[in-house]
C-alpha cells in the first residue's frame, strides 16, 4: 500500500478497506471505524473518500471522528471543530472525541458544545440547490476566482475585521488585511489599514473602498474605484445579479447568511456561482452573538472551516457581539491556519497525554511554545510517548517525544536526531540553535 499510494488519504482508505473486507468475509459486522489525522485537510478528505468507497461496496459501518493530537487552547478547539464539524455537517459521523492537550475533563464540554451546535439545525427550512457539474467534495480543489486587487486567484484568503464599533486595538500577531468601519470615520481611525466604508458615506481617498448591500447593486456602476464590496445572500443571486458580478471586475462579494443551516445556504450560493460560470471573488461572512469565547471559536470554526475545506472562500469576515474584536481576529487567523489555507504562525501537534506519558506534558508544551512561537510556518510535534508519538506527528517538521521517565527524544522530520535525553533542558535556553 505504501509503495502504491504513499502516505496519502488514498493509502489510508486502501488499508482500512482491506480489514473491512476481511470482517465482511468472516461475517463480523461489529466494527466502528476511527480514521484520523492531525491535518484537518487530510482527515476530512480521508473520511469522505472512505464513505464513498464503503458505499460502493455496500458497506455502512459507523464512524468515529476526531482530529488527532489537536493541541491545546484556542488552536486545539478550532482545529477539532474544523475537522469534526465539516464531517458532521455532511451527515457523516456517529461518535466523536475532541483531543486536547489539557486535563481530560476539559474535552467533554467542548465535544458537547460542538455536537449541540450541529443539532441546532434540525428541522431547518430546506435549501434548494444542486451540486455544480464537475465538483468533487473529496478532492475539493479551490474554486477558481479572478484576481481583484490581490483578492482571489491563488492569493491566500484575506481577513476582514469588523471595527464598526470603534474598537481599534490590534494584536500584531493577528492583524487583519482590511477593516470595516461602517458609516463614519471615527477620530481614532488608524491610517495604515485598507478600509471598507458604507457606500453612501464613502469618500474617494487612498485605501478606502465602498461597501454596498444587495438593494444597492444598481449603484455599483456609479463608483469608479478598483475595488468594491457588496454583501449578498444566496437568495440575492438572481440571474441579473450574477450578470452584474460577471461584468464588473472590481466587485468582491461578501457572502452572508441568516439561515439556520448557514453552511448549506452558503454552499448552495457557491455552487450556484460555479454552475453560472461566475468567477467573482467571495468573502465568507458570519454574524454571532456569543459571550462564551469557546462557543464562538467552535461555531465559527465549523461554519467557516467547512466551506474552506470545500475549496470555497477568498477571505473571511467574522463579527461577534459579545467579545473584543481582537478575539474575533485571532479566531479568523486560527481557522485559516487549521484549514491550511493561510499559515500565519507556528503549528503545534500535541497529544492529550495518557499513562505512558512520563513527563509534565502541559508545562512542556507551554515552554516549547514560548521558545518557538515566532517560527511561522513550522510544525512541531510534542508527544507523550514513543508508542504512538512518531507516527501521529508524521506531519511535523520537528518532534519532541517521550522516551522514559523525564526523558525524551528529538526528531527532525521522521529521523531521530537525539535519543533519551533529559526533558526540558534543551529548551531552557531558547537561543541554542543546534536543537532547532
What spans do the regions from the language model cover?
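Catalytic alpha/beta core domains of metabolic enzymes, predominantly
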Residues: 2-148, 227, 237-375, 379-382
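Residue-level detector of conserved catalytic or cofactor/ligand-binding positions
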Residues: 425-436
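Active-site beta->alpha loop and helix N-cap motifs at the rims of alpha/beta catalytic domains
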Residues: 1-18, 161-170, 175-263
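N-terminal basic/disordered segments at the start of proteins
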Residues: 142-167
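Nucleotide-binding motor/catalytic cores of P-loop/tubulin-like NTPases across gene-expression machines
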Residues: 89, 386-392, 396-412, 416
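A structural signal for short secondary-structure junctions
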Residues: 91, 151-153, 311, 372-375, ...
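Short acidic-hydrophobic, aromatic-tinged amphipathic segments that line or gate anion-handling sites
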Residues: 418-422
Amino acid at each position: 500500500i505504501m509503495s502504491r499510494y504513499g502516505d496519502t488519504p488514498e493509502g489510508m482508505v486502501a488499508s482500512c478497506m482491506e480489514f473491512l473486507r476481511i470482517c465482511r468475509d468472516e461475517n463480523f459486522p461489529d466494527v466502528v471505524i476511527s480514521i484520523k489525522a492531525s491535518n484537518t485537510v487530510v482527515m476530512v478528505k480521508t473520511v469522505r473518500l472512505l464513505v464513498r468507497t464503503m458505499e460502493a461496496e455496500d458497506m455502512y459501518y459507523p464512524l468515529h471522528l476526531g482530529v488527532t493530537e489537536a493541541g491545546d487552547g484556542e488552536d486545539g478547539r478550532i482545529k477539532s471543530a474544523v475537522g469534526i464539524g465539516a464531517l458532521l455537517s455532511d451527515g457523516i459521523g456517529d461518535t466523536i472525541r475532541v483531543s486536547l492537550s489539557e486535563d481530560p475533563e476539559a474535552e467533554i464540554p467542548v465535544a458537547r458544545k460542538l455536537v449541540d451546535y450541529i443539532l441546532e439545525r434540525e428541522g431547518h427550512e430546506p435549501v434548494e440547490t444542486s451540486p455544480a457539474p464537475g465538483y468533487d467534495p473529496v478532492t475539493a480543489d479551490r474554486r477558481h476566482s479572478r484576481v481583484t486587487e490581490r483578492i482571489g486567484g491563488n492569493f491566500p484568503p484575506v481577513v476582514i475585521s469588523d471595527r464598526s464599533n470603534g474598537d481599534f486595538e490590534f494584536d500584531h500577531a493577528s492583524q487583519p488585511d482590511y477593516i470595516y468601519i461602517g458609516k463614519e470615520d471615527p477620530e481614532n481611525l488608524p491610517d495604515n489599514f485598507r478600509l471598507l466604508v458604507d457606500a453612501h458615506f464613502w469618500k474617494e481617498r487612498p485605501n478606502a473602498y465602498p461597501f454596498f448591500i444587495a438593494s444597492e447593486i444598481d449603484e455599483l456602476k456609479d463608483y469608479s474605484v478598483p475595488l468594491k464590496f457588496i454583501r449578498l445572500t444566496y437568495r440575492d443571486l438572481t440571474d441579473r445579479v450574477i450578470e452584474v458580478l460577471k461584468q464588473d471586475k472590481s466587485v468582491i462579494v461578501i457572502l452572508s447568511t441568516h439561515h439556520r443551516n448557514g453552511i448549506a445556504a452558503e454552499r448552495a450560493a457557491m455552487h450556484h456561482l460555479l454552475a453560472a460560470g461566475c468567477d467573482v471573488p467571495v468573502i465568507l461572512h458570519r454574524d454571532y452573538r456569543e459571550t462564551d469565547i469557546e462557543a464562538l471559536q467552535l461555531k465559527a470554526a465549523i461554519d467557516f472551516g467547512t466551506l474552506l475545506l470545500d475549496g470555497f472562500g477568498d477571505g473571511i469576515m467574522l463579527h461577534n457581539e459579545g467579545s473584543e474584536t481582537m478575539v474575533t481576529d485571532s479566531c479568523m487567523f486560527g481557522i485559516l491556519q487549521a484549514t491550511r489555507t493561510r499559515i500565519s504562525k507556528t503549528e503545534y501537534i500535541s497529544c492529550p497525554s495518557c499513562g505512558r506519558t512520563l513527563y509534565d506534558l502541559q508545562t512542556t508544551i507551554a515552554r516549547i511554545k514560548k521558545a518557538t512561537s515566532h517560527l511561522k510556518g513550522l510544525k512541531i510535534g510534542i508527544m507523550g510517548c514513543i508508542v504512538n508519538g512518531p507516527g501521529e506527528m508524521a506531519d511535523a517538521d520537528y518532534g519532541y517525544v517521550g522516551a522514559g521517565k523525564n526523558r525524551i527524544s528529538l526528531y527532525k522530520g521522521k529521523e531521530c536526531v537525539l535519543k533519551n535525553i533529559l526533558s526540558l533542558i534543551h529548551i531552557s535556553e531558547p537561543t541554542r540553535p543546534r536543537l532547532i
